[in-house]
Amino acid sequence: MSKQPRKQRKALYNAPAHARGKHMSATLSKDLRADIGKRSLPIRKGDKVQVLRGDFKGHEGAVLGVDYGSYKITIEEVTLSKPDGTAVFLPVDPSNVMIIDADMDDDRRIKNVTGDN
């Protein structure tokens, strides 16, 4: 395993689909950490997050989409308005958000979080 930044970036850009999900993780709020027993989880559509960095710091909203190609997520309240007045979602890096409420409707995700096989 190389530690050269260029090779690390290349590995990130050329990562297979099953490995990209691990890179799309965000920290959990203190309440969720206590409940789940983990520090971070991969982000999913439907999770409620809070933005920690950038112009939209402090905004909360549900995750509307996860783009594994560009490693970005779109959040409900994080929008910009175009000159014609239409709203456009601003892509946010998952490292800049904190999961406030994880969507636990999926049995596979519950098993993944709890460690039950």
Curated annotation (Swiss-Prot):
Pfam family, one: KOW
GO BP annotations, alphabetical order: translation
Biological role stated in the UniProt entry: One of two assembly initiator proteins, it binds directly to the 5'-end of the 23S rRNA, where it nucleates assembly of the 50S subunit.
Entry superkingdom: Archaea
Matching HAMAP family: Ribosomal_uL24_A (MF_01326_A)
Biased composition (Basic residues): 1-10
Record-level GO cellular component terms: large ribosomal subunit
Protein name as annotated: Large ribosomal subunit protein uL24
Subunit architecture: Part of the 50S ribosomal subunit.
GO MF assignments: rRNA binding; structural constituent of ribosome
Record lineage: Archaea, Methanobacteriati, Methanobacteriota, Methanomada group, Methanobacteria
Family assignment from sequence similarity: Belongs to the universal ribosomal protein uL24 family.
Record NCBIfam families: rplX_A_E
Native source organism of the sequence: Methanobrevibacter smithii (strain ATCC 35061 / DSM 861 / OCM 144 / PS)
Record key words, sorted: Ribonucleoprotein, Ribosomal protein, RNA-binding, rRNA-binding
Region described as Disordered: spans on this chain: 1-28
